[in-house]
């Protein structure tokens, strides 16, 4: 049976890179939704795009990894009109919620399940931003031979956004933990996996 658990690996950003993003996001500009993806560019965020994904210093993130994420200093249920200085901060959190009934961390939160007790308070009051370069997803049907072990493994696909050096993914947090929010896959993602961040 094919499990719909997704996104258990992404390439994160360093503390310095997260701090740079926070400084740019809280530069006093009003928060506005873009008309189209082309409105955002590398220059708008003034953020260095990696020259080569294979040689760049990578921060590989897996469940239980401790990494920096961007957290609001305000109650996300109330919101703010603009992201002023101090509205966002870096927090070093562990990927995955712990629970009494599951020994493994719960690292994805289905948006359709946001009203369940484990997610409810975080979804309403404690949303966060997971900033990454790209994320990986395993195919549900395709396999390949591992160069390292010689065993058959699921084919991995890397997902990015064209002309965007950083992807912002919705997350929620509590205490020292965070979880990635997922939804049904769009047309680009669906051939590989039924869910996406």
Where are each of the predicted segments found?
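Short linear sequence motif anchored by a di-proline
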Residues: 1-197
């Amino acid at each position: 049976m094919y499990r719909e658990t997704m996104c258990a690996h992404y390439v994160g950003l360093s503390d310095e890179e997260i701090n740079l993003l926070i400084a740019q996001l809280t530069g006093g500009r009003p928060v506005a939704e873009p008309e189209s993806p082309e409105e955002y560019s590398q220059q708008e965020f003034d953020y260095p795009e990696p020259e080569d994904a294979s040689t760049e210093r990578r921060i590989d993130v897996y469940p239980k990894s401790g990494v920096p994420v961007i957290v609001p200093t305000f109650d996300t249920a109330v919101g703010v009109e603009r992201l002023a200085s101090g509205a966002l901060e870096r927090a070093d959190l562990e990927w995955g919620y712990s629970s009494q009934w599951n020994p493994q961390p719960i690292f994805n939160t289905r948006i359709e399940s946001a009203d369940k007790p484990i997610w409810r308070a975080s979804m309403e009051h404690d949303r966060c931003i997971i900033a990454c370069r790209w994320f990986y997803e395993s195919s549900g049907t395709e396999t390949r031979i591992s160069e390292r072990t010689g065993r058959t493994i699921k084919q991995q696909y890397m997902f990015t956004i064209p002309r965007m050096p950083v992807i912002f993914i919705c997350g929620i947090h509590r205490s020292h933990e965070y979880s990635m929010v997922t939804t049904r896959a769009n047309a680009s993602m669906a051939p590989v996996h039924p869910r996406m961040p």
